């Protein structure tokens, strides 16, 4: 997911470098993939007794910049605010995309949006995530079910964020594509754009933003469960 699948859409792939490579592995294949990585000289710091249940396991290779993360789920199941996002991606049949086995284009765009949304409510996001979303939407426009995408985003209160991401990509980053109904192309994106530019590359450039994200995450969780936020009483 993300990474090289997105960088290949940039005019120059080196403009979209990745610190790691994220691989989504079905639970039934996870340990086999783990063993294969060890066979190829990679190592992990995750204790052996945690491998069977860990959502994410990281691997490095001595003398190499290679950094791989295996994921059982796209969103950490230990985070109450985001765990329910995983249901969008169950029982998906992968397709081959430029030599990679990946989610179909519609689901991958949904993932890019929800992944960016997760970072936004946690601490903030960077312009690169808007580039990823815009370039993917433009490249696979005809393969996206735009009505269903809107319904999916709306069901988790992310439709306004997604519309703003599309508008920033098109109006400010020059990644032009048609935004069909029911998407709102006239949304005011200035507050989100300002927040993005103030947040640094990854959005978390100061402790104040990281602290305030605790309140935001709690509100997101409450909005999905119908509960009252427990941070502000």
Predicted regions: what they are:
Residues 1-19, 25-233:
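Conserved NTP-donor binding/palm subdomain of two-metal-ion nucleotidyltransferases/polymerases, i.e.
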């Amino acid at each position: 997911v993300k990474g090289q699948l997105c960088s290949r859409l940039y005019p120059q792939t080196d403009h979209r470098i990745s610190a790691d490579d994220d691989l989504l592995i079905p639970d039934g294949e996870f340990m086999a993939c783990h063993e294969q990585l060890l066979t190829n000289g990679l190592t992990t710091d995750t204790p052996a007794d945690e491998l069977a249940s860990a959502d994410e396991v990281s691997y490095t290779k001595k003398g190499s910049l290679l950094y791989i993360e295996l994921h059982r789920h796209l969103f950490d199941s230990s985070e109450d605010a985001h765990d329910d996002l995983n249901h969008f991606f169950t029982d998906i049949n992968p397709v081959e995309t430029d030599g990679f086995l990946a989610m179909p284009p519609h689901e991958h765009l949904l993932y890019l949006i929800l992944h960016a949304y997760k970072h936004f409510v946690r601490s903030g996001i960077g312009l690169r995530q808007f580039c990823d979303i815009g370039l993917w939407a433009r490249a696979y426009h005809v393969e996206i079910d735009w009505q269903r995408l809107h319904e999916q985003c709306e069901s988790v209160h992310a439709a306004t964020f997604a519309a703003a991401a599309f508008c920033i990509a098109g109006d400010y980053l020059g990644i032009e594509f048609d935004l069909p109904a029911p998407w709102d192309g006239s949304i005011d994106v200035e507050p989100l754009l300002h927040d993005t530019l103030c947040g640094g590359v990854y959005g978390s450039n100061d402790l104040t933003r990281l602290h305030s994200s605790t309140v935001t995450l709690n509100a997101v969780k409450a909005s999905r469960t119908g509960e009252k936020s427990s941070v502000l009483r």
